[in-house]
């Protein structure tokens, strides 16, 4: 085909996707299947129904004030008597979808978490009305206590006491990354020329951000081995022993291989931190952790060293809500590193944050993240919008109260059926991997062609064209959009398909189309007398 992939070599996979979509959409009367983006086509409905029902209760609460005025004017919610009024609302509307969940939520908050029910309801009502600035700006008080219960249970398996964790509510995982990188630079914890270890393959911005001129960091790749279930070998993880490596970035479970770190890898990192690198900073993005079986975050094994980024986007189908948190242990090496800065650097930071409090040096790193997110001077208006925080709380309560994990198991079964369907039509079983999460599949062209027609054919097929050329051919001839694995730092010729954003019959179509292309290549191979 006429498309020259080389001219697009510097584009990120997500920008390249737009070019692939143009090609895939270029023929009339053909359905374009975009398996390139991870936006799920499923979502949690119960906590959304609860959100809208809560909004109606909140509006009624507001109208308890200024009822003598023109219709449509309300006031701030009143704490006194709110629990009784809410229970009457639940009793009167129990037959409506979402209301029963709200009643259970109040019971769980009061009876299981031991929180003040009136304070919870007042924060939720005030929050959903969006009538006040977020106070505290880092996260609403009761909301933080609830959401951190969810984070600790899902990401750390309860290994970290919830009370030892601080949260910063942010506009999704992407905002979290932007805030963290910028505050690390501003604070002097990362400086130009510093080495950063990056688990590869990885979400592309983790490759691109350190290369920006404002950071100018030296990347040290920590390669996952595709022939060992996409795990980091001991030799690769041992690169973290280098004292010049300041921070380790990773996505766990990985993107795009979609594999969680196994116990050996976690134990290796724990040992390195304990024995050689107690000063190592770790940043882990664990957005896919809820799709894994018995997931354990680096935050659970190295809590003092780790900033945990979690987004509600994938598990709850909430990419448009922009909901995420940054979690930090209250006793962490980021704060310790600030205390070890040279006096000149401390004085510069004293000046930067002087408007926030008298004793700037007591300001924790996570609170500096909040201030830096609004260039310090606007710290008093920082924070995630309160309606967003309310929806985050309802998502968290939905998961916490689902003791049988019915929602989680339904999603796991859904995406795993999709993977099985794709590979069935491709003519092979999916690779067995006990640590696989299956949110994405990295279709390894070399592995697929080898399994279908042998090693000799595989070597020939890979030499015929680049992965990019192959992906453009797939888009042009089949209308299917896959993203190149190399754009995520993979060394293997491969295409990433999301298993979350299409329906099962569409994954069957993808598998058949890829098999057809492989068969056509094999016919060319045979015609050359190479069989």
From Swiss-Prot:
Pfam families assigned: Aminotran_1_2
InterPro entries, sorted: Aminotransferase_I/II_large (IPR004839), Aspartate_4-decarboxylase (IPR022518), AspAT/PAT-like (IPR050596), NHTrfase_class1_PyrdxlP-BS (IPR004838), PyrdxlP-dep_Trfase (IPR015424), PyrdxlP-dep_Trfase_major (IPR015421), PyrdxlP-dep_Trfase_small (IPR015422)
Binding-site residues, L-aspartate: 114, 255, 496
Residues annotated with N6-(pyridoxal phosphate)lysine modification: 314
PROSITE patterns: AA_TRANSFER_CLASS_1
Activity regulation: Inhibited by 10 mM Co(2+), Mn(2+) and Ni(2+), and by 1 mM Cu(2+) and Hg(2+).
Superkingdom: Bacteria
CDD domains found in the cross-reference section: AAT_like
CC cofactor: pyridoxal 5'-phosphate
EC number(s) from the headed UniProt entry: 2.6.1.1, 4.1.1.12
pH dependence, entry free text: Optimum pH is 5.
GO molecular function annotations of the record: aspartate 4-decarboxylase activity; identical protein binding; L-aspartate:2-oxoglutarate aminotransferase activity; pyridoxal phosphate binding
Catalytic reactions on record: L-aspartate + H(+) = L-alanine + CO2; L-aspartate + 2-oxoglutarate = oxaloacetate + L-glutamate
Alphabetic keyword roster: Amino-acid biosynthesis, Aminotransferase, Decarboxylase, Lyase, Pyridoxal phosphate, Transferase
Alphabetical list of Gene3D superfamilies matching this protein: 1.10.20.110, Aspartate Aminotransferase, domain 1, Type I PLP-dependent aspartate aminotransferase-like (Major domain)
Temperature dependence: Optimum temperature is 45 degrees Celsius.
One of the protein's GO biological processes: aspartate metabolic process
Subunit record text: Homododecamer.
Function as written in the Swiss-Prot or TrEMBL entry: Bifunctional enzyme that has both L-aspartate decarboxylase and transaminase activity. Has high activity with L-aspartate, and much lower activity with D-aspartate, L-lysine and L-glutamine.
Family: Belongs to the class-I pyridoxal-phosphate-dependent aminotransferase family.
Protein name, as recorded: Bifunctional aspartate aminotransferase and L-aspartate beta-decarboxylase
Gene from which the chain derives: asD
